[in-house]
């Protein structure tokens, strides 16, 4: 299984998102689907244009912004591979949030 870490922003976002009806689905995507190797076929993952390594995962009305851990980060954590979840945002806020990644 891959390691999935949450940034402080993602932890704050997730706390808010878990209070919504989509909360259980978001939690499943982060804890189970992203950690699975290989990812489930129904996991909707797309690269974010113009952002380099950042990816977007669709989870109901929410979008999860993440990137793969680089080799140094994996080595420091003692894992072969993993991901850093940076934000968990409502889809209507995604474009505003993405300005920081470009």
Regions found by a protein language model. Give the residues of each.
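Enriched for short, Lys/Arg-rich terminal
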Residues: 58-63, 67-102
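A short, surface-exposed loop/turn module that caps and links secondary-structure elements
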Residues: 31-58
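A generic structural signal for beta-strand entry/edge sites
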Residues: 1, 52-54, 80-82
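Arg/Lys-rich, positively charged N-terminal/basic patches that mediate binding to nucleic acids
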Residues: 1-31
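Short histidine-centered beta-strand/loop micro-motifs
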Residues: 15-16, 46-47, 56-58, 75-78
